[in-house]
Amino acid sequence: MTTLPPLPMTRPKLTALARQKLPCSSRKIPRSQLIKEKDDIDHYLEVNFKGLSKEEVAAYRNSYKKNICVDMLRDGYHKSFTELFALMERWDALREAARVRSLFWLQKPLEEQPDKLDYLYHYLTRAEDAERKESFEDVHNNLYALACYFNNSEDKWVRNHFYERCFKIAQLIKIDCGKKEAEAHMHMGLLYEEDGQLLEAAEHYEAFHQLTQGRIWKDETGRSLNLLACESLLRTYRLLSDKMLENKEYKQAIKILIKASEIAKEGSDKKMEAEASYYLGLAHLAAEEYETALTVLDTYCKISTDLDDDLSLGRGYEAIAKVLQSQGEMTEAIKYLKKFVKIARNNFQSLDLVRASTMLGDIYNEKGYYNKASECFQQAFDTTVELMSMPLMDETKVHYGIAKAHQMMLTVNNYIESADLTSLNYLLSWKESRGNIEPDPVTEEFRGSTVEAVSQNSERLEELSRFPGDQKNET
């Protein structure tokens, strides 16, 4: 394509007159006269600016987009011109639609982006040349270069267009044992996954996985294509299973996650295998298959321990605690939650600490261990204050308030049951101040022993009175 320096701004008389009469002028001039004057200008420029042909003058006068299109047609690249023109039309349509939706949409028209036009011209024409020679690998490489160039948030639809072209061409390439086809399936899977079409994405990722089995192919960064296929399939299967679990399709979700687990083992990546086990365990928990869930989650914890991955191990303890809680095994659930709290604290995982403390507090509160519940909820609340998270702060504050109320409840009940003047005075004093209610300091044996036991060991008394079965088990 010819590019010329700007012409001098000093204009001869003919040029100055012509600028006033060209179509951009507001005057109404007959078309025949304009054509004649245009020819006169071309002749004048050809005579007075030596070395400028009529085509070069036209190249200077026309827009960059028009020059690109003219060059394509003049050089015989009719397919490239057709594809470029269709892309420009769609570009303008999308730009107009976006402009209507948002007043602040700032993407430039394609004709105002010469770098992109240059890329399109260069690689489309080279791809067309290669197609004429039936060199399909070169066709694919040129189209793939365009897909990579347009891999950004604004131009993603252009990238997807060239991914689709690459996919069609890759199926014609036979000399690489299917590597290009495998990569094309990977890109098509990504295209559908980003669009939320998970079933279509899974189909392409399955084909990608099948084509890479037993191969040592690597991508541009040196990563194994088979490992990438396993990761892509696991990610898609997990997203599919999430939707199935939302719809309470537990059997289908478990089935697809078992398949994901098998693929993860094939990939020989322990981290990936652990992730598959974790989500499979959660699916069994949702389906109320508790024993199976415990078995699978135990496998996850063992792999996490082997990998020395504390954060994953903490997540496993949390999941196991949920299963045990669902089974009514509160004592065992508390053990795992304490481990989860310890890991979260040691690794400065504040959100995990809030979640673990809240779960632990809920169990203590349910069992009537109000002092311990209050301590757990206070820990959760203090952590949310450090995080400056208002929604979490409000939630933990409610839990903490309920636990404190339960903690005070036993002392208040004992004052009421005593039914004497001193107890009444304490209750009235507390009602006025609404502070922490103090135990009765009266030294009588029956009152002192009762209040002291309530204030210092309320959770132990509750265990004796309300959960005799648990006490027997402990002894």
UniProtKB/Swiss-Prot annotation:
Signal peptide: none annotated. It comes from the Eukaryota. Expressed in spermatozoa (at protein level). Residues 459-475 have a biased composition (Basic and acidic residues). The keyword Repeat applies. Residues 437-475 are annotated as: Disordered. The TPR repeats are required for axonemal localization and flagellar beating. It comes from Homo sapiens. This is Tetratricopeptide repeat protein 29. One of its GO terms (biological process) is cilium movement. GO terms for cellular component: cytoplasm; cytoskeleton; sperm flagellum. It is found in: Cytoplasm, Cytoskeleton, Flagellum axoneme. Keywords: Cell projection, Cilium, Cytoplasm, Cytoskeleton, Disease variant, Flagellum, Repeat, TPR repeat. InterPro entries: Bac_ResReg_Asp_Phosphatase, TPR-like_helical_dom_sf, TPR_rpt. Axonemal protein which is implicated in axonemal and/or peri-axonemal structure assembly and regulates flagellum assembly and beating and therefore sperm motility. TPR repeats lie at residues 92-131, 136-173, 182-215, 234-267, 274-307, 314-347, 354-387. It is linked to Spermatogenic failure 42: An autosomal recessive infertility disorder characterized by almost immotile spermatozoa due to multiple morphologic abnormalities of the flagella, including short, absent, coiled, and bent flagella. Some spermatozoa also show abnormalities of the head, acrosome, midpiece, or endpiece.
